[in-house]
Amino acid sequence: PNPINGAIVEGNKLDIEKYRSFVGYYPMPQRHGLTMGELALLFNKEYGINCKLHVIPMLNWTRDMDFEDTGLPWVIPTPNLPTNATSYVYNATCIFEGTNVSEGRGTTTPFELVGAPWIKSEELSRDLNAYNLPGVFFRPQYYTPTFSKYAGELCGGVYVHITDRKTFEAVKTSWVMLYHIRTKYADNFKINKPYVEGRPSLFEFEAGSDDVIYNQTS
């Protein structure tokens, strides 16, 4: 099943002419709402793979179900997605991987924390909560990563609490957080350089569209 339900679709469509990569390969929205089987059927038919594919349908699953509703144990897909709750907030905070803002790696709650040494926690929490985004609350948080960005340094930031998974708009939350931080802390915020010269940066690959990269004005 889709771990963050199959009922909600959000985000811009990936521009494959400019930003196709291992991050995103086909022109789909960031939060696509599909199951693994549905993705396989889509890729196979619409994008010319045309293999002999057989998908075993799930029993008793409906699109509005959260992973925890299935009663299945959470199997960690990657060390930095330790819980089902993390998979929800990942859609909102993974964009910071390509910036000099910490996305919480090096802590026990990766992707649920966002911060940097030059951010004032209480100030950022107050500002983000003022947007009244549905299903989320930003708690002021100081933390010190043990590895990754700012290892051993005290970071100010926020803990992203999802208060209602049914109304939480992960991608909208992502763009609001990004816009506010890159505007409020313009003297410090930076997009990391590309890993390969002449190629797009990780930030650009994750954003996937010039509409997001260059039109973050409101």
Label for each model-derived stretch:
Residues G115-S218:
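Conserved functional hotspot residues or short segments at active or partner-binding sites
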Residues I8, N44-G48, R182:
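Sec-exported extracytoplasmic/periplasmic mature domains
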Residues Y19-N91:
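Conserved anion/nucleotide-ligand pocket segment
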Residues P3-Y19:
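Glycine-rich, charge-decorated loop segments at or immediately adjacent to ligand/cofactor-binding or catalytic sites
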Residues W61-D64, D69-Q141, P145:
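Glycine-rich, aromatic-lined ligand/substrate-binding cores of catalytic
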Residues N2-I8, V55-N60:
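Short, surface-exposed recognition loops or helix-turn segments adjacent to catalytic cores
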Residues K52-D64, T108-A116, N192-E204:
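A short, terminal or domain-edge coil/loop segment
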Residues K18-F22, E103-T109, A151-V160:
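Short acidic (Asp/Glu) and glycine-rich catalytic loops that position anionic groups and cofactors
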